[in-house]
Amino acid sequence: MPAENHTTLTPDTPVRYLKGVGPKTAERFEKLGIVTLADLLCHYPRRYIDFTKPYSIAEAPTDVECVVRAEVFAKPGGRILPGGRRMERITAGDDVSSLEITWFNNPYAAQKLQLGQEYYFQGIVTGGMLRRQMVNPQVRTAEQIKASPFEAVYPQTEGLTSNAIAKCVRQLLPHAELLPDPLPPEMLAKYRLLSKADAVRAIHCPATEEQAYAARRRLIYEAVSYTHLRAHETDQYL
């Protein structure tokens, strides 16, 4: 059960009852207009990171977000910098080039990587062809990408990152049926639309680009139908 001390979940259950969401985090969610579980399920991603199309190190664009596939060549370890920050550094590479990867104040990120193992690093590549670098990237294995090839990127706020939002959303996805479906079954069948629950699960965690498209199509259709209904109701009162 994803909620703490709140055995019955409803769309109106406050988001603070989610595991790991304390009062301060709930306040940050509220800055995004997220107060209830329904609000969180309907906080849709603004884009996705596609881990299925990685670059080689040499071909990776610089100064923009991208995914690079590389093998861990060396793990020289970490050190403490002036001011108390801890720096961890590894060298990764492929058949042609090498990539220097650095993490600050995140020793576990480097320590969990295995020498000789291939990983997918998502971040911003800097430097020239002779020395390429990446700082604080996200890391995934091939097995993780097979299970979840697209990573949702959410609108965020200070103190509440997209990753933190994604963790909370994943808690709720098994309970997507909490949201009522405003579209009747005959309409879903006629226009070949996903159910509300399936669309919400797919928009947050699509397995393919086609699945993400189907989810967006359903949710856009719902929004347009709602707008038309409100316009019709307004006309009746004029």
Task: Kindly label every feature range from the protein language model.
Residues 2-19, 27:
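Extended, structured, electrostatic nucleic-acid-contact surfaces
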Residues 26-30, 40:
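Short alpha-helical segments in extracytoplasmic peptidoglycan/chitin-binding modules
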Residues 49-64:
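Short boundary/loop segments of OB/S1/cold-shock single-stranded nucleic-acid-binding domains
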Residues 63-80:
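Structural detector for short beta-strands of small beta-barrel domains
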Residues 78-230:
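Upstream accessory/linker segments immediately N-terminal to the RecA-like ATPase cores of bacterial MutS
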Residues 228-238:
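Residue-level detector of conserved catalytic or cofactor/ligand-binding positions
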